Amino acid sequence: MSEFLADGAELFAGICVRDYEQARPWYEALLGMPPTFLAHETEAVWEVAPHRWLVVEQRPERAGFATQTLFVADLDARVSAAAGRGIEPADEEVYGEGVRKVIYRDPEGNEIGFGGNPSAAA
């Protein structure tokens, strides 16, 4: 875990769910790791990069409306690893110059995307 506020800022991106007990293992499989810490019994926090956190919290009144995107260095490796853990994408988008976004939807409809630039070989 990175030193908190070492560079002066931390980003916490939230995802609200109705069923935390169902959501937490799904996010563990998607991200390939357990939470970095548990804020309380219905809130899990993953450090997805230094000073960048993904928060999954039980808040039924706000569940199902999140849209988060993480750009990663090796999109294909990320997608393959998630598939190996039983998590398959719902969709894929391709933008100008070959930039891609692979979209996952959790059991409650929240959208988590992984983005990547085209490979140098392309």
PLM regions and their residue ranges:
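Short beta-strand micro-motifs in enzyme catalytic cores
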Residues: T42-A44, Q68, G98-V102
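N-terminal beta-strand motif that seeds the catalytic metal site of vicinal oxygen chelate
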Residues: M1-R24, H51, A66-Q68, P118-A122
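A short, compositionally biased micro-patch
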Residues: Y20, A39, A49, L75, ...
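Conserved short beta-strand elements that form part of the metal-binding/catalytic scaffold
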Residues: M33-A66, E111-P118
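Conserved active-site tyrosine of GNAT-family acetyltransferases
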Residues: A23-E28, A82, G109
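Short secondary-structure junctions
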Residues: L31-L38, I87-E93
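Mid-chain, well-packed structural core segment of small domains
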Residues: Q68-I87
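Vicinal oxygen chelate
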Residues: M1-A6, I15, A83-A122
